[in-house]
Amino acid sequence: MNIKKSLVIAFSAYGCFLFGQEKTIDTVYIFDSQMSRVKRFHRVNAISTEDIRKNSSSLSELLRFQSPVYIKENGRGAVSSPSFRGTSAGHTAVVWNGININSNFLGQADLNNIPLFGYDRLEVKSGGGSVQYGSSAIGGSIHLNDQLEFGKGFQGSLYSEAASFGTYINFAKAGFSNDRFSFKASANYSISQNDYEVKEKEYINRNGRYYNTTFNLGTSYKLSSHHIISWQSQMFDASQRYPIFVENGNKTKYNAQTLRSLVAWDFRQSSFTNSLKAAYTEDNFQYFGDIDQPKTSGADGKNYIIKNDLNYFITPKINVNAIGEFQVNTAEGYQSGLGSIRRNMGSVAGLLRYFPTEDLRFEAGVKKDFVEDITSPVLFSFSGKWNAVKWYSTGMNVSRNFRIPSFNDLYWKQGGNTNLVPETSLNVDMDHEFRFGSLKLTLSPYFMHIKNYISWLPTPYGYWAVFNTYRVDSYGLESQVTYEKQFGKHGLKLNGGYTYARSINKQTDKQMVYVPIHKAVANIDYRYDFLRVYVQGLFNGLTYTTTDEKKADALDPYFVLNAGVSGTLNKKYTLGLKVNNITDTVYETVSYYPMPKRNYSIYATINF
């Protein structure tokens, strides 16, 4: 792992005082203070630690079965791209503790090069969010958040899993805290030979091996009743081999290393909070055209970030929030089409929130980004939420969002284009939430208009080049139903969702590629005393893979069913069994790369 040791000194403050609804820093410290405010106006779905264990092989698998996100994966464990609401991976922001971590090289994230274990909160937000979270937050955002608790003493846990295809997952976490000091560390190691076979397709996932290692460290200290300093770091090292279609094919691989470090200094009073953060992130990769030879190409990227978030209640009903950020981005390519790059960028955002009653609230925001050599648009957002009656609430969100061109888009030789302008989108969506006892139903229609779409196209000169091209209209419906009930020792929990997505290229009036029109997920949990059983289903509709909507080349609809059972003794020891793809379905999320058929895993957890 060729990451240089880096020291980051920063200052930060978490503080949010929205009607006294949030936990104070006396109990828990959350690095992404903005998220608690976002939840006042937007629907955010949280995935619990227990739910993560249902789909523990990767972040890709978890989001595929437990969110509205469509995951395009070049076979299990290979390159994986997330997309919301008929958009693309470039319109999806991945946010680590409030910091946007999309690759500067690609402008998007490979979910299989992001660790799954180690976070305290994993949350999914659909819809625009560039005012709060920056570039690419057009279709939605995925939030990976850490928190540090106080007054808990010593806590720890061990998790180990063995699964089909030579897959092993191990995760350990330990922490200690008293009233003023909190410390937490965790480590994860996952490896898989990943050599599954799909006989119906005459396919063997040759050269599919992968592994990854993650270390997380976090600490926080209360200087006084109003000041707290905190630090969180993550180190990740991974290797993916890319599948080949013939026995004697050329074997390739991709190695990646990331380092993320964030230091924070928080100041908090009853009506005023300030959060000053400094972060350093590093993303390195090496591509091997032959796994037995030295690297063929690669690149190193470094980001230096300082961010301040000030939140002030002028009156109990009026709240102002100012956010400033400055970054220095550097990159160095190695035989990859990129040379040496340095870019400065910053932003200033302001939000005004008004709470006329406990059941009615409004928020308006404006933001201006300053990106070196790129003209960025003024962004805005407006949100309102009304709890009309006990059983019904509604909300509306209107926003302008953007995506800046990536380093590859701008500087790749040949084909990069320094004259590109950012993509911009106008987003409109509504939330209608109905509650009937323990049952909750949410309907969220949406519309997006994206212009200056950045696309790579073939040229007469024998290479591909990038241009601002067509416009795209995306519209549809996201829905979610939840139900939870306890009957003595019996417990039942249901979480399901359906997404209808139309994403139309206005130049051709055809559906965008790799955008399923229909997707549905369902998770049912049953508990009795120490026993837990779950069933999990995924339906994915017809998915076009060509721009002319050619059905012969489209991915067929599919349904996949998973299930698992576990038992817990003394609230400390858990043993479980999972069966994935019980239906033995043959399916693909990317053409020519089938996913695994029926497979199994067993796992054990110890809490202490």
List where the protein language model places each region.
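N-terminal periplasmic "start-of-domain" segments of outer-membrane beta-barrel proteins
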Residues: 25-53, 81
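Outer-membrane beta-barrel signature, preferentially recognizing the C-terminal barrel domain
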Residues: 247-268, 374, 387, 393, ...
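Short strand-turn segments of transmembrane beta-barrel domains in outer membranes
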Residues: 129-131, 141, 146-176, 187, ...
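Flexible loop and strand-edge segments within Gram-negative outer membrane beta-barrel domains
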Residues: 192-198, 202-214, 222-303
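Gram-negative outer-membrane beta-barrel transporters
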Residues: 357, 447-449, 468-545, 571-572, ...
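C-terminal beta-signal and adjacent terminal beta-strands/loops
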Residues: 450-451, 539-546, 565-608
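Short acidic/polar hinge/loop motifs at secondary-structure boundaries
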Residues: 71, 99-127
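Extracytoplasmic beta-strand/coil segments of soluble accessory domains associated
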Residues: 60-99
